[in-house]
């Protein structure tokens, strides 16, 4: 009989379901639980191996006939923003991101709901309640925090805090070799700001200031318009069967 160490992770496989990225495809995921004293170390190892975190679950695609989902991470030390990305930074000079503990707030959920209703009305998260949101944010056994973006105020240069309602929010994991953007959302009425791009650019700079070599962006899916934007942040590394390979 095969025995397993008491704290060894157990992996499970989901049933097939429609792929949210490629029409006509079906997805399956392999997943394990991130709980207990080894959760942080396990999250490190699995993220570096192409997994993503959702609450206390780490998962990666395990589709039978498709390998389109590719883990990507930005090489922070070599990144230089493009002309269009510099324009995004300029448009958002009036914003400041403040790291804070992963505690949910009603103003965050209100923004989250507006974002889902405007951008992902047919997605799997559209029915999330305030309790679901709270669990997404605070149900974690790893090192994580929120970065909440607000407009700059008269005292921002002194205290680093913005004013007014949040305009964008990112749930961010801290790893030994980088930051991982777990989930982000933003004010849909501020589309001209390109807030999704701005948060990635801001997190690249945060990783740089922390001396971390990578920013993990999750999966890039060739042929999916939803994921095209991730290819614009280079140089980056993509996880291939032989390991991480540099692109750009």
From Swiss-Prot:
UniProt xrefs under Pfam families: ATE_C, ATE_N
Location, primary (coarse class): cytoplasm
UniProt subcellular location: Cytoplasm
Domain of life: Bacteria
Keywords annotated in UniProt: Acyltransferase, Cytoplasm, Transferase
Record bears the keyword Cytoplasm: yes
Entry annotated with the keyword Transferase: yes
Gene Ontology MF: a single term: leucyl-tRNA--protein transferase activity
NCBIfam families xref list: PRK01305.1-3 (NF002342), PRK01305.1-4 (NF002343), PRK01305.2-3 (NF002346)
Function: Functions in the N-end rule pathway of protein degradation where it conjugates Leu from its aminoacyl-tRNA to the N-termini of proteins containing an N-terminal aspartate or glutamate.
Family membership: Belongs to the R-transferase family. Bpt subfamily.
Protein name per Swiss-Prot or TrEMBL: Aspartate/glutamate leucyltransferase
Species annotation: Methylobacterium sp. (strain 4-46)
Gene name in the database record: bpt
